[in-house]
């Protein structure tokens, strides 16, 4: 009893001591800085990684899994896109950071009609779309009467002109320039009017979606976390 209580106290103390360090390693998307983690001792790094899973309310990985995560994902070759599955999630690496990414049914090839009059629940638990009165980065021209609004996933167009860039560019290049991690590229809702791409929500508006008159709408995407 005393041993177990002491052990529990030590864990609680570790939580308290490591919490500020873990928070310092994380960004707004809760990804971890690999370079900083690499400076820690193995014991400390393992403890930080375990607490990272705990912060996400995930099942605790074993010591062996944590070691694999470090070797196979964090230390993978620079040009690799490594990932390791933990139950319903994957740990992935992008730009020297570790991300915990939920595994979802790929929504690519789904085309969802959206009448705009009501909010729209996205497939694969990707959140909810609705119109808002505020203007923001998802402010686009309003559709004309003969334009049907659909939501799609996964860019098929190769060449795009987006607001804020002068020339048309390859879609892959745009994702890279805007720092969108590869797995997010198929999870960002794309707004189409008929077959014309208007916007990738929270990311860019195309030339065709640019506001040119007072008729504009703003779409809010509430992502599920």
Segments and roles (model prediction):
Residues 2-225:
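AMP-forming adenylation/ATP pyrophosphatase catalytic core
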């Amino acid at each position: 009893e005393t041993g177990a209580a002491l052990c529990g106290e030590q864990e609680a103390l570790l939580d308290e001591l490591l919490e500020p360090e873990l928070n310092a390693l994380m960004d707004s998307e809760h990804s971890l800085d690999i370079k900083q983690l690499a400076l820690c001792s193995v014991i400390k790094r393992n403890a930080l990684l375990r607490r990272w899973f705990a912060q996400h309310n995930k099942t605790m990985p074993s010591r062996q899994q944590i070691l694999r995560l470090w070797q196979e994902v964090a230390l993978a070759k620079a040009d690799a896109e490594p990932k390791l599955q933990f139950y319903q999630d994957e740990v992935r690496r992008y730009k020297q950071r570790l991300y915990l990414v939920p595994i979802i049914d790929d929504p690519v090839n789904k085309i969802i009609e959206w009448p705009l009059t009501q909010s729209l629940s996205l497939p694969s638990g990707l959140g909810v779309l609705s119109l808002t009165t505020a203007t923001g980065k998802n402010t686009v021209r309003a559709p004309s009467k003969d334009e049907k609004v659909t939501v799609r996933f996964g860019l098929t167009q190769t060449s795009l002109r987006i607001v804020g860039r002068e020339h048309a560019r390859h879609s892959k290049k745009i994702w890279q320039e805007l720092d969108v991690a590869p797995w997010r590229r198929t999870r960002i809702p794309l707004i189409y009017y008929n077959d014309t791409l208007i916007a990738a929500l929270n990311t860019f508006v195309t030339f065709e979606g640019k506001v040119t008159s007072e008729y504009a709408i703003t779409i809010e995407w509430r992502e599920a976390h």
